[in-house]
């Protein structure tokens, strides 16, 4: 069975991260709630101010804390669709009001998002590169958005290491969130981090779940940051395979260009995910994503895994 459904790094984490995780033995002691060493290493990696860096149980955990602080019943949350499904779940759980904005050409956010912003808009959620479509957003539009509203703009950069996204936004109404789950290969440990505006740091730390990361997880993340070359090597291999897989898929289906570690395409047949599963390949059926039709998302795996997917797809399509 080949799993190409969850956008994981098929090469796994740095061996140094695995060793750091395994070697920690003080499991009877609670973590240090400051996570200072990890935050400083994140600062070295990103260039961000360590005093404004927070960590959480994945990007999801960070977003949950922000919603706990900021969203009151009836507050509006602007969500370009299709995008990461948890945004919808969290908005509903927080009694916020979803304002859905359909993406434009090539699934990019366009000028229509400005019409969705009102005095009640509290948060604008932007996944960049976007899950499940894989596209990156226009830097100029993001900058205009930041300057046009007082609402908090949450930039989810879970897949940024796989992209050509290079612009940096540092403003009083911007949160940038990233993860160790994708490029760093630590998905099972659920380690997210974010850069907050200064005014939000104290409220966030007061509202966050106590000890959101275990010490072994934090130590693994620190070791991963000490071996960034491992991650970059994995990303290089994944990007090369992404290009190869894209070219092969183009011969079979209409597939979207991607700046992430997955590809997104409209299925020419019904129940494609089920048919691929019968042939030993697990992909993500995106029909449940708000704003998605009969689409499939496939993770870029190792070359042999991608070949198995392509062979199974050809068999289903009768090619």
UniProtKB/Swiss-Prot annotation:
EC number(s) recorded for this UniProt protein: 2.6.1.9
Domain of life the protein comes from: Archaea
GO BP terms: L-histidine biosynthetic process
InterPro entries to which the protein is assigned, alphabetical: Aminotransferase_I/II_large, HisP_aminotrans, HistidinolP_aminotransfase, PyrdxlP-dep_Trfase, PyrdxlP-dep_Trfase_major, PyrdxlP-dep_Trfase_small
Pfam families: Aminotran_1_2
Nuclease keyword on record: no
Catalytic activity: L-histidinol phosphate + 2-oxoglutarate = 3-(imidazol-4-yl)-2-oxopropyl phosphate + L-glutamate
Functional pathway: Amino-acid biosynthesis; L-histidine biosynthesis; L-histidine from 5-phospho-alpha-D-ribose 1-diphosphate: step 7/9
A GO term, aspect molecular function: pyridoxal phosphate binding
Entry keywords, A to Z: Amino-acid biosynthesis, Aminotransferase, Histidine biosynthesis, Pyridoxal phosphate, Transferase
Co-factor requirement: pyridoxal 5'-phosphate
Enzyme class: transferase
Presence of the UniProt keyword Amino-acid biosynthesis in the record: yes
CDD domains given in the database record: AAT_like
Location of N6-(pyridoxal phosphate)lysine modifications: 182
Family statement drawn from the similarity comment of this UniProt entry: Belongs to the class-II pyridoxal-phosphate-dependent aminotransferase family. Histidinol-phosphate aminotransferase subfamily.
PANTHER family linked: HISTIDINOL-PHOSPHATE AMINOTRANSFERASE (PTHR43643:SF6), HISTIDINOL-PHOSPHATE AMINOTRANSFERASE 2 (PTHR43643)
NCBIfam families noted in UniProt: hisC
Protein name: Histidinol-phosphate aminotransferase 1
Lineage of the species this protein comes from: Archaea, Methanobacteriati, Methanobacteriota, Archaeoglobi, Archaeoglobales
Gene label: hisC1
């Amino acid at each position: 069975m080949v799993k190409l459904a969850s956008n994981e790094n098929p090469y796994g984490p740095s061996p140094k991260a695995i060793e750091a995780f395994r070697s920690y033995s003080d499991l009877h002691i609670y973590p240090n709630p400051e996570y200072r060493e990890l935050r400083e290493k994140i600062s070295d990696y990103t260039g961000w101010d360590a005093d404004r860096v927070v960590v959480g149980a994945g990007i999801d955990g960070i977003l949950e804390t922000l919603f706990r602080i900021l969203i009151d019943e009836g507050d509006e949350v602007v969500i370009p669709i299709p995008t990461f499904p948890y945004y919808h779940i969290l908005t509903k759980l927080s009694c916020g009001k979803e304002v859905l904005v359909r993406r434009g050409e090539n699934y990019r956010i366009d000028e229509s998002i400005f019409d969705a912003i009102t005095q009640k808009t509290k948060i604008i959620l932007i996944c960049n590169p976007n899950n499940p479509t894989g596209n990156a957003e226009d830097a100029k539009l993001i900058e205009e958005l930041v300057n046009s509203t007082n609402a908090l703009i949450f930039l989810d950069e879970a897949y940024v290491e796989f992209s050509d996204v290079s612009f940096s936004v540092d403003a009083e109404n911007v949160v940038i969130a990233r993860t160790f789950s994708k490029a760093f290969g630590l998905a099972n440990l659920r380690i997210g981090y974010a850069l907050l505006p200064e005014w939000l740091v104290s409220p966030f730390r007061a509202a966050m779940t106590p000890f959101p990361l275990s010490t072994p997880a934090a130590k693994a993340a620190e070791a991963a940051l000490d071996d960034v070359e491992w991650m970059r090597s994995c990303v290089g291999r994944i990007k090369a395979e992404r290009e190869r897989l894209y070219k092969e898929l183009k011969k079979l289906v209409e597939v979207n260009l991607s700046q992430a570690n997955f590809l997104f395409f409209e299925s020419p047949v019904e129940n494609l995910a089920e048919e691929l599963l019968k042939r030993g390949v697990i992909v993500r059926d995106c029909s449940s994503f708000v704003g998605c039709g009969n689409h499939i998302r496939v993770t870029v795996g190792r070359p042999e895994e991608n070949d198995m997917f392509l062979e199974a797809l050809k068999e289903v399509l009768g090619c």
